[in-house]
Amino acid sequence: MTIGIIGAMEEEVELLKNSMPSVEEIVIGGAKFYVGEIAGKEVVLLESGIGKVNAALGTTLMADRFKPEVIINTGSAGGMAEGLAVGDVIISDRLAYGDVDVTEFGYTYGQVPRMPAFYQGDAVLLKKAETIYREYFAASENKAVYGLVVTNDSFIMRPDQHETIRTFFPDVKAVEMEAAAIAQVAYQFDIPFLIIRAISDLANQEATISFDEFIHLAARQSATCIIELLKTI
C-alpha cells in the first residue's frame, strides 16, 4: 500500500521527511515529492505549496503519478470553535469551501457546481484516528476535536471574515487554505482521505503573530499524530 501525505509548507512536512530512513526527491511542476518509508509504510510525501490551486495541482500529480491508496493531509489551521487552543488537533469529518458562492444557480454556499456541498473524510480512517488519539491525548494538555473544516484562499483573522464563515458554517471548527481542494481531488479520483490539522492560531487579529510563533508546534503535533496513525494502516 502506498500512502500519500500532503503538507503545504516545508515546516509542515519536515518532521515526516526526517522520519524517512532514505528519501528520493522528485520535483514536478514546482511540487516537491519525497518517496520513502515511515513506520514501515511506503509513503509519498508532498510539499504542495500554499493555497487551493497548489494543493489541487499537487494532489492531482500525486494521484496520477504515484497512485496512493490513501491520502492524508497534515499541517496547521486556525481555530474557530470555542475552547480550542494552540496545539489542539482537528480531525475533519467534513470539508467545505468558504469562498465559493454560486447560490444564484441553486447551489449551497461553498459548493462548487456539480460537486458535493461537503467532502466527507473516510469513515474507516476517522475511526482509526478516533481510537488512536483518545489514547494519545489522554495525558496531554491538548485535545483532538472532530468536525467541519472550511477552506479559503485567505488567511482568516478579520471580524468580517469570521462573520461570513460563521453565517454559512455555524458549526465550523477550523479554517485553513488547502484541505477542501485536496479532498475534492481525492473525491474525484475515488481515493479515501483524511484531514488532520493542528491549531497554530485562533483566526483572530493576533493570528499572524500566533502563526509565526506556533507553526512549528502545530506542525510537530500534526505530524506526530499522523505517524501514530500510519502504524495502524
UniProtKB/Swiss-Prot annotation:
Keywords: Amino-acid biosynthesis, Hydrolase, Methionine biosynthesis. GO terms for cellular component: cytosol. Disulfide bonds: none annotated. The active site is at E12, D201. This is 5'-methylthioadenosine/S-adenosylhomocysteine nucleosidase. It comes from Listeria monocytogenes serotype 4b (strain F2365). Belongs to the PNP/UDP phosphorylase family. MtnN subfamily. One of its GO terms (molecular function) is methylthioadenosine nucleosidase activity. It catalyses: S-adenosyl-L-homocysteine + H2O = S-(5-deoxy-D-ribos-5-yl)-L-homocysteine + adenine; S-methyl-5'-thioadenosine + H2O = 5-(methylsulfanyl)-D-ribose + adenine; 5'-deoxyadenosine + H2O = 5-deoxy-D-ribose + adenine. Catalyzes the irreversible cleavage of the glycosidic bond in both 5'-methylthioadenosine (MTA) and S-adenosylhomocysteine (SAH/AdoHcy) to adenine and the corresponding thioribose, 5'-methylthioribose and S-ribosylhomocysteine, respectively. Also cleaves 5'-deoxyadenosine, a toxic by-product of radical S-adenosylmethionine (SAM) enzymes, into 5-deoxyribose and adenine. Signal peptide: none annotated. GO terms for biological process: L-methionine salvage from methylthioadenosine; L-methionine salvage from S-adenosylmethionine; nucleoside catabolic process. PANTHER family: 5'-METHYLTHIOADENOSINE/S-ADENOSYLHOMOCYSTEINE NUCLEOSIDASE (PTHR46832), 5'-METHYLTHIOADENOSINE_S-ADENOSYLHOMOCYSTEINE NUCLEOSIDASE (PTHR46832:SF1). InterPro entries: MTA_SAH_Nsdase, Nucleoside_phosphorylase_d, Nucleoside_phosphorylase_sf. Substrate binds at G78, I156, M177, E178. Gene3D superfamilies: Nucleoside phosphorylase domain. It is an enzyme of class 3 (hydrolase). Pathway: Amino-acid biosynthesis; L-methionine biosynthesis via salvage pathway; S-methyl-5-thio-alpha-D-ribose 1-phosphate from S-methyl-5'-thioadenosine (hydrolase route): step 1/2. CDD domains: MTAN (cd09008). Its EC number is 3.2.2.9.
